Amino acid sequence: MNGFSTEEDSRDGPPAQAAPFFGQTCCLIDGGERCPRPAGNASFSKRVQKSISQKKLKLDIDKSVRHLYICDFHKNYIQSVRNKRKRKTSDDGGDSPEHETDVPEVDLFQLQVNTLRRYKRYYKLQTRPGLNKAQLAETVSRHFRNIPVNEKETLAYFIYMVKSNRSRLDQKSESSKQLEA
């Protein structure tokens, strides 16, 4: 019903909506060989093709096929590659295996849209107008992960501020109170 095929659907035959596509196989060529899996409801759009070429995957469309439908395996594979975080070292035993623990995962989607916009404005990030919250959070998190940080200096400053019970926000509010008086 939702456009995704299930195991039940494949056992019982094609669902009513996918009846015209029955018997079609995936339109992709994977590593030089045509994919033999049955085509699902997902199509190989220009956007998907662009993301595949950017990731340098060994997938191409078979020109002899008259449809653009891909199998569920390739749909999930493309989605997983598209959603994977870029890492500085590769997963196949890169330079330092403990590097993955050094990069904390920060969920910037929890922030308000106005906060994300302020971040974008402060760092002058280039985006197209009219981004929704998810797109804005993705852009900001991509930038956030690439900011170089002097960890020792930052931690020392943080500890100093905690011990002295002060923060920049406290200083600003005190100076504004003095101006009002």
Swiss-Prot record:
Gene3D superfamilies documented for this protein: 3.40.1800.30, 6.10.160.20
InterPro entries: His_deAcase_SAP30/SAP30L, SAP30_C_sf, SAP30_Sin3-bd, SAP30_zn-finger
Segment forming the signal sequence: none
One Gene Ontology biological process: negative regulation of transcription by RNA polymerase II
Purpose of the protein: Functions as a transcription repressor, probably via its interaction with histone deacetylase complexes. Involved in the functional recruitment of the class 1 Sin3-histone deacetylase complex (HDAC) to the nucleolus. Binds DNA, apparently without sequence-specificity, and bends bound double-stranded DNA. Binds phosphoinositol phosphates (phosphoinositol 3-phosphate, phosphoinositol 4-phosphate and phosphoinositol 5-phosphate) via the same basic sequence motif that mediates DNA binding and nuclear import.
Assigned protein family: Belongs to the SAP30 family.
UniProt name for this protein: Histone deacetylase complex subunit SAP30L
Gene, per the UniProt record: sap30l
